[in-house]
Regions:
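Carbohydrate-binding surfaces of carbohydrate-active enzymes
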Residues: 1-270
């Protein structure tokens, strides 16, 4: 719905700049690079079983979702939302009370988004995070902190010094707002920090970045690891604990060898 609403909305530089799908994939890739256990969900799902929810460019906010997001954070979850989020409701009508999402989400995130700057390619906007300088790309929201902690601020233009990224404790959890579009390098750094703060460990430790790993839990509580080699070369790595190779039926192993573009399924009994 957010994609359709964005595409039907004039402004924001046109659909060639909005790039909703590319943005979602980029955030997913940044989390995937940390070998996190990921799931793609919609806003109607049960949020309670997750520690961290990332909502990039959630432009359209259905009725009742803001209350459920507040409940999720209040109960200990961490929510990360980005620029161009919660601008319209399910009827494509703007929210009263300011962005993001009117009074409810303004309270949750502790910010007010006054405006959004569409960055021309020749304009360089930057911000600093964890001692490193990063480039803003395409979009930079002009934010005001209303109780939120400023994690990063802009370095230039008329809104220099205003927040680019914020965080606010709410109940037992935390709401983080990324008001700027960035390259993958920042997202990888940022989500690495956020995953650690949330206590989310990698699915498997020390897995090469060239491998894709996902985990699912069986009805008996056993853990199943689906591992794909995404390279044209052989990959070898040592497992952090013994696992049964049920795909190749080679029994319990402690070291995995995958051929080029190979795959396997490993099982850990409970």
């Amino acid at each position: 719905e957010s994609l359709w609403a964005l595409d039907s909305t004039n402004g924001f530089g046109g659909n060639e700049v909005k790039q909703y799908e590319k943005t979602v994939v980029q955030h997913y890739r940044a989390l995937w690079k940390h070998n996190a256990d990921l799931a793609v969900i919609n806003s109607d799902c049960d949020f309670g079983k997750y520690k961290l929810i990332v909502a990039p460019m959630l432009f359209l906010l259905k009725n009742g979702v803001s209350e459920r997001l507040k409940e999720f954070v209040r109960n200990g979850g961490t929510l990360a939302m980005t620029y161009l989020s919660a601008y319209v409701d399910e009827h494509n009508a703007c929210f009263f009370g300011g962005n993001p999402g009117g009074p409810d989400l303004r309270e949750l995130f502790g910010i007010w988004s006054e405006d959004i700057d569409g960055l021309e390619p020749q304009v360089r906007q930057t911000f600093d995070f964890n001692g490193k300088r990063y480039d803003a790309v395409d979009y930079a929201e002009f934010l005001h902190a209303e109780g939120a902690e400023v994690l990063a601020a802009y370095n230039s233009e008329f809104y220099a010094g205003s927040p680019a990224i914020t965080s606010k404790c709410y109940g037992k959890g935390k709401a983080v707002y990324i008001g700027v579009r960035t390259e993958l390098d920042f997202l990888t750094e940022f989500y690495g920090t956020l995953l650690n703060e949330c206590g989310i460990s990698p699915v498997l430790a020390n897995v090469p970045e060239s491998l894709s790993v996902s985990r699912r839990i069986g009805t008996d509580g056993s853990e199943y690891y689906f591992i794909l080699n995404l390279t044209p070369g052989k990959q070898i790595f040592r497992l952090p604990f013994p696992l049964e190779d049920i795909w190749n039926k080679t029994g319990e192993i402690t070291k995995l060898t995958l051929p080029p573009s190979g795959s396997t399924v490993l099982k850990r009994k409970q």
